[in-house]
Swiss-Prot record:
The lineage of its organism: Bacteria, Pseudomonadati, Campylobacterota, Epsilonproteobacteria, Campylobacterales. It comes from Aliarcobacter butzleri (strain RM4018) (Arcobacter butzleri). Residues 82-85 are annotated as: Involved in Mg(2+) ion dislocation from EF-Tu. It is found in: Cytoplasm. This is Elongation factor Ts. It comes from the Bacteria. The gene is tsf.
Amino acid sequence: MAGVTPQLIKELREMTGAGMMDCKNALNETNGDLDKAVQALREAGLGKAAKKAGNVAAEGLISVLVNSDNTKAVLLELNSQTDFVAKNENFVNLTKEITTHALNNGIADAQTLASSKINGEEFQTYLNEKIATIGENLVARKLSLVSGQVVNGYVHATGRVGVVLAATCNDAVKDKAAALLRNIAMHASAMKPTVISYKDLDPAFVESENKAIRAEIEAENDELRRLGKPQKRIPEFVSKSQLTDEAIAAAKARFEDELKAQGKPEKIWANIIPGQIERFIADNTQLDGRFALLSQPYVMDDKKTVEQAIAEVDSSIVITEYIRFELGEGIEKKEEDFAAEVAKQMGK
């Protein structure tokens, strides 16, 4: 078996919450492939949806800057080596200066930033001077420039998460749309959607999660059954992308058959079936609520979705772009081999 180490087992446990032996077996079955082991556990109903936060190891700050008329915004991730430096006033000011430079000069990404000039000198020369002053290696790792009819953003007070959104709308409601986008950006910083709409979800991902979510609920039902508590419905689907007209029609026909079998008068079916259809859709779109921004319960009022909250402000508002940075996302932890490091330093 390739690469099945105690460290890997520990990491899989932290990612999924599954038991040690279950994690070990899953890694053995997948030849040490962490991602495949996570999916194997989920499909067996043994692990929760994994977040790859365990692989994140970076310090620094996320910065968001929006221009005065809410038509452009820059999102920047500036990394340092330690949290101590990230809280340093010089580092905070540096982050603001780079973000302002990017916004004022229409710099769209980190590569363009690296080749730009700031305060009359090459960006890397400028950054090297700051490195010498601050005393740690610094990296402007990610940068995005967002433009649109209306744009707004939010950065969490800790500087570890930032979100920028763009939308189209009627000119008359632009100010309302800008205020709404800030609130939705705040929502997205906490709820971590990966796409704007369920329509943006990859079909292969939907199919994979269909099995995994069913397995999760079946595992929960085993425990509820043991405790003598009501069990959850097992969904047929997990996303609106799977809910064809035929699927909804089949559900409606099934509800009609059930009401008929229960002896309910046909004249009251019209009062009952719409609620059943609504519940059917909610039960069968759980994936959308996890990953699609518009389908998520709105944190400002969880009785409505983000999509419904937008419609209440004005039906002309349409979100067209969504970018979320989380500090260190995608950076792998460095595994230290202290024996090898000592041997290297001793020239062995």
